[in-house]
Amino acid sequence: MSPSAIHNITSDLPSSQQHRPFAGKVALITGSGRGIGRGIALELGKRGASCIINYAKSAGAANEVVAELAKLGSKSIALQADISKPADVAALFEKALKHYGHIDFAISNSGMEVWCEETEVTPELFDQVFNLNTRGQFFVAQNALKHCSEGGRIILTSSIAAQMTGIPNHALYAGSKAAVEGFARSFAVDCGRKRITCNALAPGGIQTDMFDENSWHYVPGGYQGMNIDTIKDGLAKMCPLNRVGTPADIGKIVCMLVSDEGEWINGQVLRCSGGGV
């Protein structure tokens, strides 16, 4: 990869045309009204992509992201869809295609994290988690394979929890994400006929509202109600870079994967944790 290409992918770029490598590209990002999805959309928008900002219920946060993207020169829209429902996923892609005419990048980010003692998991809770985290991502990938332009990109979202050991009461969530890693490897094969790549990200230690609610579980000796700064300090010490991650960190990784230079990365699960556990 050339130095100039690396600069374009990884820097905080101004919105000038010479630094907009994704101008003319369209990215559909599920669950992008907040958190990691929002961070991905903003990084893609900085680089010229038009974004479909998906939300499940409230349009407020999604519309705020659209407004932020407009300031960056990105012509984006907010579309509602409950990703746990395959019919909603199909309709989301159809609406996006009707608006833009094509989709180049599909980033499946919607998800939920739960902690529940295994003996207390009900069939209803199991279905709720797997319908969103697992089945939803399968049908995002399926529709992306059907509708994305040749040479496009599909990115699914796993979690470092899928490979971690020693975390109690986490089988339901970890299992829902581990399945996604299998999807990425298999879809990469089937997407090859359209030169579409498929990879999965396994983020860890990324500060979002979900992080604020749940990260105490990952800190040795952590407890509910623990001061968030204490949690951040504890997790930072578990990372060689001595910090927690941000949604922008994941957004920049996505920009690398969807770039022309990222084509040879395919069927992989990328652990995105700054080297931390």
UniProtKB/Swiss-Prot annotation:
Residues where NADP(+) binds: 36, 82, 109, 173, 177, 206, 208
Effect of inactivating the gene: Abolishes the production of scytalone.
Induction: Expression is positively regulazed by the cluster-specific transcription factor pfmaF.
Gene name as annotated: PfmaG
Function of the protein: Tetrahydroxynaphthalene reductase; part of the gene cluster that mediates the biosynthesis of dihydroxynaphthalene (DHN)-melanin, a bluish-green pigment forming a dark layer in the conidial wall that protects the conidia from UV radiations. The first step of the pathway is the production of the pentaketide 1,3,6,8-tetrahydroxynaphthalene (1,3,6,8-THN or T4HN) by the polyketide synthase PfmaE though condensation of acetyl-CoA with malonyl-CoA. T4HN is not stable and easily oxidizes into the stable form flaviolin.
Pfam families per record: adh_short_C2 (PF13561)
GO MF entries: quinone binding; tetrahydroxynaphthalene reductase activity
Protein's name according to its UniProt entry: Tetrahydroxynaphthalene reductase PfmaG
Pathway the protein takes part in: Pigment biosynthesis; melanin biosynthesis
PANTHER family the UniProt entry points to: 3-OXOACYL-[ACYL-CARRIER-PROTEIN] REDUCTASE, SHORT-CHAIN DEHYDROGENASES/REDUCTASES FAMILY MEMBER
Cross-referenced Gene3D superfamilies: NAD(P)-binding Rossmann-like Domain (3.40.50.720)
EC number(s) per entry: 1.1.1.252
Presence of keyword Oxidoreductase: yes
Keyword RNA-binding tagged: no
GO terms classed as biological process: fatty acid biosynthetic process; melanin biosynthetic process
